[in-house]
Amino acid sequence: RSTWPREQQRVMVDQRRAGVVGLGLIGGSLGLDLQALGWEVQGLVHREVTAERALARGLAHQVSTNPSCLSGCDLVILALPIARLLEPDSALVDALPSTAVVTDVGSVKAPVLKVWSRLHPRFVASHPMAGTAEAGVEAGFSGLFRGRPWIATPDSQTDPLALQLIQNLAESLGS
């Protein structure tokens, strides 16, 4: 049960369309868990063959190689390698809705926060402390985050409601 005030709990309830960019271990696991919580999940991947496999595995309701698939999302999770977070594709940045909450799941925080806080007004740097040695579209599974810490690293410019949504997200996933 959440210990957050009721008006802050609503932040989670009102947001129900998520985009997951990258459907490897972390992104794929998020896609499965978010769907189990009732979210509509849009997946974005780099290659068509990956999109087909991710869809076949049920990692998202829809999977695309076109960043425009994120246009209606309330939440976008960047499950990308650190190098791609630090130098994001301009088509991805341009496709992010300005009202969406955007977070990453990378293990490096300060450089990612520095880059993304300039790129999106509702960015929250975060990192679930969960994983396995597996990688790629075959690696994701339900329940990866249960019982695992999930940290957020806001700065003074972080939107408090965006931060609250990420905290609620982590709690809803069992972190």
Predicted features by range, described:
Residues 71-72, 98:
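Alpha-helix C-terminal capping/helix-to-coil transition sites in glycosyltransferase folds
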Residues 88-139:
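Rossmann-like NAD(P)(H) cofactor-binding subdomain of soluble oxidoreductases
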Residues 144-175:
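Internal alpha-helical scaffold of NAD(P)-dependent oxidoreductase catalytic cores
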Residues 76-77, 103:
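N-terminal Rossmann-like NAD(P) cofactor-binding module of classical short-chain dehydrogenase/reductase
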Residues 79-81, 106, 154:
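Glycine-rich, N-terminal phosphate-binding loop of Rossmann-like dinucleotide-binding domains
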